[in-house]
Amino acid sequence: MPKFPQFRLILVLFYLISMIQWSVITFSLGFFLNVCIFAYFVFFKSLPDLPKPQPRFVDIVPESSNTVDVDKELKSVEGLIQDGNAQIGKELESIVNLIIKDFVQPWFTKIDKNSDAEFLKVIKWRLLQTLLVVKDKLMKNDSASLIVLKLLPIFNKHFSTFCDAREAVLSDLTLERHKSANIDLQIAVEFNKNYKIHKSLSLKPNALQKEIEKSIRKTVIGLLPHLFDNDELDSLLVFTLMTEVLTTCIISPLIFKFTDPDSWNLRIVSLSQNYFEEKHKVHKIRRMLSKELQDHRKVMNDVANKDVGEPSSEKLELNAEYTGKQFEHYLNQLDSLLDLSDIKYVAYSLALKIYQLKENEHLTKENLKYKKRLLLSLNLIESKLSFPGSEIDTASKKLAREANYPDLNMDNGIVLKEMASFLTSITLKDIVDDSEFLPFFESFLGSVPETQGSTFLEYSQTIESFKNPLEDATSEDIISGYSGISTMQLQEISSKFFHNNNLQNMKLLDEGLVKNIILFRNSFQINNDEDTFILARKSVLLLQTEAIKYLDDRFLPLFKKTPSFLKMLSTSHIISTDIYAHFLSRIGGVNNPEQNKIIKDNVKTDFMNPVRIFANPGITDALDNIVNGSGSKPHKSRISSNPRYSQLFGSENDNIFKDKLFDDENDNTSEISVVEDQLDHPRNMEKVSVSSGNSGLNPSQFYGSNNFRDNIASLTISIDQIEKELELLRHLILKADLTNNQMQLKILKKSQRTLLKELEMKELLKQQYMVQENGNSLFRKTKIYIRSYFSENSSNGLKEITYYIINIHHFNNGQVSSWDMARRYNEFFELNTYLKKNFRDLMRQLQDLFPSKVKMSLKYHVTKTLLYEERKQKLEKYLRELLSISEICEDNIFRRFLTDPTPFKLNKEYMHDDILEEPLHEPIGSSNSTSNSSSVVDLQSSEDGGELNFYEDERHFFTDSGYPFYSQNKSFVKQICDLFISLFALNKANAGWLRGRAIITVLQQLLGSTIEKYIKVSIQKLRSEDQVFEAIVTFKNMLWGDNGLFERKRNETAEATRSEGERLRTEQLALTSLQRLFADTCGRVVGLRDSHEAAGRVHAMLQNPYLNASLLLEALDAILLDIICND
């Protein structure tokens, strides 16, 4: 091969000669030829071969099976995603499969048509891993703080700025400009001057969606390092694919949907319709329950004439194969049971079958349904055994308060508890002494690998068959009766049980006793000695005792865990045994005529009998009619503006409740007409709307001692009535869940929540009355905590007023009630002055605890925040010290300070006794006052012990152990109040009486609980598995459902787009629906006009797509920063 330098020189010379001598064509051909030759030698002979190019996405698929087993990893992550709740895991996996189907397979099938390709498995694996990361971060996130402390201020500022911008634009536009101008864009521009829209939006025409998607893509790019490993993101395809999937498949569709005003309008209309339909159905259900209670005498005429018959020879049995009709017939048979022995046998049989199913951890769908039927039937039977004052009766009342009826997790039932104790109490002697039960135990011993069990049982029975009943192996005086027969028996026992394998088993009991018997056997032929015989016989009896103990300690517990044990107790022979008699004694004693008479009397008088109500076909038909919407709907003029109460108990003349404290207005129509007459006078209107609930109570007599007792008595009757209704409703919910009637279940649960809310409010009001009426109601029964304060400007705007929010927790009769009280520093100061005047000696030790007033010389040199924080801590400590002094706790004025939400002001001319005679004013809204802002928590403890633990356990309310919603030192009151003020424009000069402490009171009326508790508990409910599952299903249907976003895109050619006229009609309908919704929920406390105006402002804000996009993107940034990128 020639040397390259010489060759290159020849080429250069040749090239120069060609340039000079050849023609243009010859030159071109020569040049091309020379270049080809030059390239061949230089590049292909002197440089190494380049590798063949590969697509970069192959890097995410393992090159060999040694790197990672994709199938194994995928199976593992699928198991982790379903850990905790299989339903949620399956829905998430289904969404991942849909993402791959819609966004990966369409282009990947052009490379590989195999639907089971390893690349698709890797993508699924990575997406599921991402969901696990998100799940872990969500579990660690404080959702309440995120929503209230971060998202709520964003929305509040956005809403306030929008209202100002809208007012400025509309006041500036003339009529001509108004017709042609883009109002939404004008408002967005004005909004941008004051608050700045999201940085990614430019407000350019027709660029909104592109800018939204660009912003989301940029956000996702910053998000990926928190969801994936860096090694995975090094692959360009992984990075690009994950970015596009998260952007175009998950986040962008949601933002686009809620940016469109028409989507909001449709959702508002749907929400409003569903709300009022459900509210109407709830009212009808309450009327139906009330009617059943009122008409019980007529319904029970036939039942009252029944005579208690003899015990039925045919026992009722519920089989797993029963159809729905057969199960209904079985329930009717349960209702007809009047003999106590029959009732108790059914209770025994049902409880035993439930325990049989509990042994199986993985029940089939059929067995799960069967278990629910068994639980329901047992619950109904317990109601028939519930005599007044009995343990079952007390437990039933307590269970009626609980809100988790549909779970059917009723292992706390009295019969089930007694059954568990009964099964534990069954002894080996009970089984061995019964010829019907013994074969089950023998069969079990024969099935286990250890042979000593069968040997010991046979040995014990053999000894029992020949020993004298009076013989005692532990006594020195053994009645042996020396004879040839006894000697032969010992010889037979020795030859049968003390040879070969049996000998080894017997040595496990006592090797020394075994040696005594072997010694007797060996010496029997040689020396027939009586002493040796007695020793052997005593050893035989002692070994029997050891054998029984061995069986009892080792084999009986194992036998009780097998299906054979429960099968043994399920035989028909059981009712004639001592074991069954022992069970009957546990659940109320043996059958007797007196208890049968009680059963019959209960049938006649107990119109709340849930068995009868449950089996009543009339109630079933009525529920079907209510749920299916049959029957007339209420006229608009008759719809009360109060969402909680409105003729819920039938006719006005029925007088189910005798107390007028809780009556809604006698005529809702007249109430609405009065309120509507005040539309032109907003201040009067608000006063009417709040005080209208007080018509049944004379304020001047509110604090009379006799009136307190009357109110407490009326409340007791009302609470008892509600508890009975809850008991009935509980069985209806169980039946709806059992029959899988989801429509009934939904409306019944809503009715249950309404009843529970009303029950809590009345119980709280009862406790507040008891605090006012009883001088011993505070000491060692009350705790307080000042978590926050709330400031606002006075009505004239000259000074700032601060209210300290006192959280009060009161213990009474095993229950803890909590409410909030807003007090100014001046009110604390007036209380302190009063107490120092009337309790001089007691207050001397507390004079240094009360925070002093700020001196005028220091007024402008003290930071307000530090001042308020210091006062908050000192006032809390001061109140706690007051509650530790019994004499002060007995003072009426001090009790009023903690229970009456009206301004606390005393006439300083009066002394202690005279002040007590001063009539106090009724709290705002009476039954809708702060008492409605309560929560009642059952401590499930005895009164004395519970009160002692409540008082001494300082951690009960101030740590996670008692109230998890008070776990962090963060207050939500200010954010909620600010939002309420912005929503209803209460910061204006004409806001009227609704300021300061009234805002706190009104908010608690609307929320039905203390503010912070309501927020925490509501968010905890949203984080529950049921709510999470429902949200995931809704998200899935929104994008991939029959009418989902992607499905509509596929069929957009066939789908008719909504016309401008349809959109306008929906917009107007949404406005009226939202106004009606606001008026119904808030009209009674803020007035109809303010409710309508607030609804109009919210509706107008949702009609601006630019600001919708800005708000959603800002909220998205805050959510991702707090949840995903917080590390």
UniProtKB/Swiss-Prot annotation:
<comment type="similarity">
    <text>Belongs to the sorting nexin family.</text>
</comment>
<dbReference type="GO" id="GO:0071944">
    <property type="term" value="C:cell periphery"/>
</dbReference>
<feature type="modified residue" description="Phosphoserine">
    <location>
        <position position="670"/>
    </location>
</feature>
<dbReference type="Pfam" id="PF00787">
    <property type="entry name" value="PX"/>
</dbReference>
<dbReference type="Pfam" id="PF08628">
    <property type="entry name" value="Nexin_C"/>
</dbReference>
<dbReference type="GO" id="GO:0071561">
    <property type="term" value="C:nucleus-vacuole junction"/>
</dbReference>
<dbReference type="InterPro" id="IPR013937">
    <property type="entry name" value="Sorting_nexin_C"/>
</dbReference>
<dbReference type="GO" id="GO:0043231">
    <property type="term" value="C:intracellular membrane-bounded organelle"/>
</dbReference>
<keyword id="KW-0175">Coiled coil</keyword>
<protein>
    <recommendedName>
        <fullName>Structural protein MDM1</fullName>
    </recommendedName>
</protein>
<dbReference type="InterPro" id="IPR003114">
    <property type="entry name" value="Phox_assoc"/>
</dbReference>
<feature type="domain" description="PX">
    <location>
        <begin position="782"/>
        <end position="905"/>
    </location>
</feature>
<feature type="modified residue" description="Phosphoserine">
    <location>
        <position position="692"/>
    </location>
</feature>
<dbReference type="GO" id="GO:0000001">
    <property type="term" value="P:mitochondrion inheritance"/>
</dbReference>
<feature type="modified residue" description="Phosphoserine">
    <location>
        <position position="673"/>
    </location>
</feature>
<feature type="domain" description="PXA">
    <location>
        <begin position="85"/>
        <end position="273"/>
    </location>
</feature>
<feature type="coiled-coil region">
    <location>
        <begin position="705"/>
        <end position="762"/>
    </location>
</feature>
<dbReference type="GO" id="GO:0005737">
    <property type="term" value="C:cytoplasm"/>
</dbReference>
<dbReference type="GO" id="GO:1990854">
    <property type="term" value="P:vacuole-ER tethering"/>
</dbReference>
<dbReference type="InterPro" id="IPR001683">
    <property type="entry name" value="PX_dom"/>
</dbReference>
<dbReference type="GO" id="GO:0032266">
    <property type="term" value="F:phosphatidylinositol-3-phosphate binding"/>
</dbReference>
<comment type="function">
    <text>Essential for mitotic growth. Mediates organelle inheritance.</text>
</comment>
<keyword id="KW-0597">Phosphoprotein</keyword>
<dbReference type="GO" id="GO:0034727">
    <property type="term" value="P:piecemeal microautophagy of the nucleus"/>
</dbReference>
<keyword id="KW-0963">Cytoplasm</keyword>
<dbReference type="GO" id="GO:0035091">
    <property type="term" value="F:phosphatidylinositol binding"/>
</dbReference>
<dbReference type="Pfam" id="PF02194">
    <property type="entry name" value="PXA"/>
</dbReference>
<dbReference type="InterPro" id="IPR036871">
    <property type="entry name" value="PX_dom_sf"/>
</dbReference>
<dbReference type="GO" id="GO:0000324">
    <property type="term" value="C:fungal-type vacuole"/>
</dbReference>
